[in-house]
């Protein structure tokens, strides 16, 4: 059987010094020989999704030690995309994913840990830890901090509405919203700790870990504030020790991340993503994680899935009054997976960290087929309605579960929100390697759209143009040189899309970029155009007034310019160099320049590609 990795630093005469250091951390003589479980935490006071994680690492650690392991905690960085949004801080968000993956690898390999519990939550942290887990391929269990409760606000006209962070951003640019109402919205938008309350990137990724088989049922939807979430943390600690012993003592390689997150598991995760209209950022992260694990999963696989998986769930920003807490009441991710399973759209035989197969897990936890009391109790967990930064601080329950699969929050394959799924891959001469649109957030009236290009060389220029009347109904806004290399860092375009909404252009314009979008974006917003402009992509050839044609049903995006003209433009651009037409007021640090040097385009997950 394989020896514990940790024996490298705990056994043998030559490790006397290392054992001395282990003892200085609290390890006792009787502990040597036990598996060392790394508790990979991401606590920070900068991020509401992580502000409550400070003591949760030690909560897991105590459970690990009670189960017979040695627990050792360390932290990763965590960037709050909402706070970093709209300024140069956003340049650092996507590159932080690689730093997180690297830091986990560095700590785990340097100290020879045997397994991991990954305590993540927000946008780049779950993907970074997922990449590390696939790279390291040691037993790993994911448990996230959980979603925030949705905000509720009573406006000056007496209306009480549910809302979230994106509503605050849109309201800020809407001149019809009074200062008093804006203050009310701002104060109510983010009432508790946790990842922002819609189906944004953080919650999307935490939901996908359930489909991948690397987290426990309820991980994606149980509120950060609810007492039931505590059991997920405790069980994660116990499971990590169990998986560790199964691998090292029983030679069960089926518990390793690459045996669990196979190509079929990635297909399950993307089927879920498409069915629930998840953030387009998930495409980047799923592609990156697959590459780390040597899984042959590409944009073509995502395209194929998007053509046969329907949209079964719409959550903010795609449906303003529905939030993750409502998905939870409807049975959470296990019930969406259950509906996909009934429709023959799921691989049931993939493994998980908690059940022999995903199918077995669905049979136990899908409220549409299971009468298990533990499932009913879990999904009755409701918001407490009290602002707090304290985890597990309330135990409110819904009166009833939402089991309506015809008109409820989660629909059946027979009665979907739409036959087409919530994400689509478009290709054409404007994006030969593909681009992504969240169709769940696109109004049916603009699924086919054409208009003249309004070209901006940066997000900042686009924001200025939108706010100052430079964009009109019918325009196709093009924002380029914002890709992984060109930004660098592939900024999110949440402010341009939010400002289009606030100007009443949300259903009257399209936006295309080689950058990316926040999970909070909706509208005809097409991102990840590949290749990016800085890599010679055709988006760099678009000129003001060029006609751009978008056909989502047929999955095409076309720059309606003759090929001879495009060839002439390419020759001209080759001579000039692929860079913005004018200088940008943007300071690019050495750290970002290093990232840009090795970053691939979005269709490859924006991972680093090293020279051979």
UniProtKB/Swiss-Prot annotation:
Q: Which residues bind Mg(2+)?
A: 81, 123-124, 492
Q: Which Pfam family is an annotated match for this chain, by its short name?
A: ILV_EDD_C
**Which PROSITE patterns did the record assign?**
ILVD_EDD_1 (PS00886), ILVD_EDD_2 (PS00887)
Q: Which cofactor does the UniProt annotation name?
A: [2Fe-2S] cluster; Mg(2+)
Q: Which GO terms describe its biological process?
A: isoleucine biosynthetic process; L-valine biosynthetic process
- What is its quaternary makeup? Homodimer.
What does the function comment of this entry state?
Functions in the biosynthesis of branched-chain amino acids. Catalyzes the dehydration of (2R,3R)-2,3-dihydroxy-3-methylpentanoate (2,3-dihydroxy-3-methylvalerate) into 2-oxo-3-methylpentanoate (2-oxo-3-methylvalerate) and of (2R)-2,3-dihydroxy-3-methylbutanoate (2,3-dihydroxyisovalerate) into 2-oxo-3-methylbutanoate (2-oxoisovalerate), the penultimate precursor to L-isoleucine and L-valine, respectively.
The record's listing under HAMAP family reads: IlvD
The family this protein is said to belong to = Belongs to the IlvD/Edd family.
Name under which the protein is recorded: Dihydroxy-acid dehydratase
Organism of origin: Cereibacter sphaeroides (strain ATCC 17023 / DSM 158 / JCM 6121 / CCUG 31486 / LMG 2827 / NBRC 12203 / NCIMB 8253 / ATH 2.4.1.) (Rhodobacter sphaeroides)
Lineage of source species? Bacteria, Pseudomonadati, Pseudomonadota, Alphaproteobacteria, Rhodobacterales
